[in-house]
């Protein structure tokens, strides 16, 4: 709703009850930088807020708005079907780690940041699931806390209290296994816990007491990835899905590990040129007998 209220304020529009023309202008504004589905999400938020404020919005009578949404969907086509963000793969993770630990940050903060990054990657976490909304305040009912982490000898569990696909906050426990590599999330978490002074509040916090936020992760990834373009916090989740697919993991496993409610995870997977080359080579050298007939529908 903040986006909507700011938009109305900037253009001197009445926010409640919203007219069809106001919603058309707002939808056009959102569509200029986001997807059709996100436009619908923003409009749903406006509708919900209006109902709370006892303002009824006759969406079914807003025919021009309906036609606009159809037009946005058609005009975007598949141009937004693949996120533009670069996936962070294990090779890029190692570059990020090297640059992070060679930076001038406090050692305790480096260890904390690395623990957060590896946990996010191997846990397929969304940014909201492991960061705090603000630097100095948090909501204990939604923020990942220190007591949501359980460390064992060769594994760790992280309890996520709420997420995008868990609107009723049933919660889910993410299992991390030690992998005996330089990217091991369990080792990173154990190293972080060994030097962290407190055991309360958000799991990931800086030495000065401030909490790790989405903006922090975005800035850190951009500054440690050797100038890689289109890096963001979501690049970790995209990279995890792409890496799992490249390793040949079945789609049901990728969907389960990432907690996707549908097969939309496929749009996160990036297929490298090397993979396409190997597939092309394999197809060209495969000695399959010539079939007597071919049915493309079979």
Where are each of the predicted segments found?
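Extended, non-catalytic subsegments within catalytic or DNA/protein-binding/adaptor domains
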Residues: 1-298
């Amino acid at each position: 709703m903040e986006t909507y209220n700011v938009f109305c304020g900037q253009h001197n529009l009445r926010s409640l009850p919203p007219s069809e023309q106001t919603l058309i202008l707002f939808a056009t504004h959102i569509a200029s930088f986001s997807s059709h589905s996100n436009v619908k999400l923003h409009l749903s938020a406006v509708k919900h807020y209006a109902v709370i404020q006892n303002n009824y919005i006759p969406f079914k009578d807003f025919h021009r708005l309906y036609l606009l949404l159809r037009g946005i969907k058609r005009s975007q086509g598949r141009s937004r079907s693949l996120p533009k963000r670069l996936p962070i793969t294990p090779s890029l993770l190692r570059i990020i780690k090297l640059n992070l630990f060679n930076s001038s940050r406090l050692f305790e903060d480096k260890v904390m940041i690395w623990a957060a990054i590896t946990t996010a990657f191997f846990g397929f976490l969304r940014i909201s699931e492991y960061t705090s909304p603000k630097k100095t305040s948090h909501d204990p009912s939604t923020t990942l806390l220190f007591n949501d982490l359980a460390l064992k000898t060769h594994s760790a569990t992280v309890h996520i209290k709420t997420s995008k696909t868990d609107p009723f906050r049933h919660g889910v426990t993410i299992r991390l296994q030690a992998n005996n590599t330089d990217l091991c999330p369990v080792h990173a978490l154990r190293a972080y816990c060994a030097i962290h002074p407190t055991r309360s509040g958000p799991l990931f916090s800086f030495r000065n007491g401030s909490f790790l936020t989405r903006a922090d992760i975005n800035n850190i990834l951009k500054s440690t990835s050797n100038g890689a373009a289109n890096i963001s916090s979501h690049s970790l989740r995209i990279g995890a899905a792409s890496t799992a697919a490249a390793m040949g993991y079945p789609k049901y496993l990728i969907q389960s590990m990432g907690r996707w409610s549908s097969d939309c995870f496929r749009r996160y997977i990036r297929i490298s040129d090397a993979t396409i080359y190997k597939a092309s080579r394999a197809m060209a050298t495969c000695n399959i007998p010539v079939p007597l007939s071919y049915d493309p529908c079979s």
